[in-house]
């Protein structure tokens, strides 16, 4: 019969204590990570969309149509002009700042249409163009959007974002109050289309939809700067599903970015931030 000696009992006790201590450490580590990285993809939170079940292959349309290829038209500049144009474009974009104080002054709709057309020239996976730009000008609708965002943002700051994230934002003097959502003459909400639809009603795959739409957002920011307008890039955490329903967008569209657009108010201020030097962002091999 096997007998437990005092030494063996002691060893077993030590092992049990060690296991429980490590379990506690892992639990605490997971809690800390959750506080540091509180982001949850809104796609996982939108209860209004269809359940994610395996779908019949017949519901999807394969792209089989042929596309004619045509000669490429290109303008090549002399090297000196290339240097000048690239420098001027850099200097223009280097003046771009995130502006939270936006005037209510009217912005011509033609300008908004042009900057969105510019954004729509972005490349996309298999040329699916998986973006929808929703332009909001109606004051009542803007205020409803503000109410939803501020309600969720207050919870974000108080509970979801975690101490480190909130601390990192203090230097920007930002909080859950978003007055610019009322004052800006135009709000542009950019939705990614998770999939599209063919003419026969079947679903079309939208490859790399989030990357494609993100590139379009970058072009939109550059176009706004070129037009002399300002904005602040807003990613409404946990607001996407409610805003999508408010704006009557279908369930296969997910809100990616919201941009309040207009002229800066006369008393607008921005943080005196410095951008990284070239040698900190570029590596030549």
Swiss-Prot record:
Belongs to the nitroreductase family. 3,5-diiodo-L-tyrosine binds at residues 126, 153, 157, 178. GO terms for molecular function: FMN binding; iodotyrosine deiodinase activity. InterPro entries: Nitroreductase, Nitroreductase-like, Nitroreductase/BluB. Changing residue 153 to Q: Loss of enzyme activity. 3-iodo-L-tyrosine binds at residues 126, 153, 157, 178. Keywords: Cell membrane, Cytoplasmic vesicle, Flavoprotein, FMN, Membrane, NADP, Oxidoreductase, Transmembrane, Transmembrane helix. It holds the Pfam family Nitroreductase. Its EC number is 1.21.1.1. The keyword Flavoprotein applies. It catalyses: 2 iodide + L-tyrosine + 2 NADP(+) = 3,5-diiodo-L-tyrosine + 2 NADPH + H(+); iodide + L-tyrosine + NADP(+) = 3-iodo-L-tyrosine + NADPH; 3-iodo-L-tyrosine + iodide + NADP(+) = 3,5-diiodo-L-tyrosine + NADPH + H(+); L-tyrosine + chloride + NADP(+) = 3-chloro-L-tyrosine + NADPH. SUPFAM superfamilies: FMN-dependent nitroreductase-like. It is found in: Cell membrane; Cytoplasmic vesicle membrane. It comes from the Eukaryota. This is Iodotyrosine deiodinase 1. Homodimer. Its cofactor is FMN. It is a single-pass membrane protein. The chain crosses the membrane at residues 1-21. FMN binds at residues 96-100, 124-125, 233-235, 275. It is an enzyme of class 1 (oxidoreductase). Catalyzes the dehalogenation of halotyrosines such as 3-bromo-L-tyrosine, 3-chloro-L-tyrosine, 3-iodo-L-tyrosine and 3,5-diiodo-L-tyrosine. During thyroid hormone biosynthesis, facilitates iodide salvage by catalysing the oxidative NADPH-dependent deiodination of the halogenated by-products of thyroid hormone production, monoiodotyrosine (L-MIT) and diiodotyrosine (L-DIT). The scavanged iodide can then reenter the hormone-producing pathways. Acts more efficiently on 3-iodo-L-tyrosine than 3,5-diiodo-L-tyrosine. GO terms for cellular component: cytoplasmic vesicle membrane; nucleoplasm; plasma membrane. GO terms for biological process: thyroid hormone metabolic process; tyrosine metabolic process.
């Amino acid at each position: 019969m096997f007998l437990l000696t005092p030494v063996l009992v002691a060893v077993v006790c030590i092992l049990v204590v060690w296991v429980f201590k490590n379990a506690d450490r892992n639990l605490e580590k997971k809690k800390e990570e959750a506080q540091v990285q509180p982001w949850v993809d809104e796609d996982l939170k939108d209860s209004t969309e269809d359940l994610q079940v395996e779908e019949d292959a017949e519901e999807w349309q394969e792209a089989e149509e042929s596309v004619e290829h045509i000669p490429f038209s290109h303008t090549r500049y002399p090297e000196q002009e290339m240097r000048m144009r690239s420098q001027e474009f850099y200097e223009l974009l280097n003046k771009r700042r995130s502006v939270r104080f936006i005037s209510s002054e009217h912005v011509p709709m033609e300008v908004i249409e042009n900057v969105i057309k510019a954004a729509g020239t972005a490349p996309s996976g298999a040329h699916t163009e998986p973006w929808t730009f929703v332009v909001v000008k109606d004051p009542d609708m803007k205020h409803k959007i503000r109410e939803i965002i501020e309600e969720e943002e207050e919870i974000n700051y108080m509970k979801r974002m975690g101490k480190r994230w909130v601390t990192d934002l203090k230097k920007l003097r930002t909080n859950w109050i978003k007055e610019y959502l009322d004052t800006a003459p135009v709000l542009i909400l950019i939705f990614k289309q998770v999939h599209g639809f063919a003419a026969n009603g079947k679903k079309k795959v939208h490859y790399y939809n989030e990357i494609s739409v993100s590139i379009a957002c970058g072009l939109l920011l550059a176009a706004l700067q070129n037009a002399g307008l300002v904005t602040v890039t807003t990613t409404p955490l946990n607001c996407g599903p409610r805003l999508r329903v408010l704006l009557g967008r279908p369930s296969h569209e997910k809100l990616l970015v919201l941009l309040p657009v207009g002229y800066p108010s006369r008393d607008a201020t921005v943080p005196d931030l410095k951008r990284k030097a070239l040698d900190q962002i570029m590596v030549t091999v």
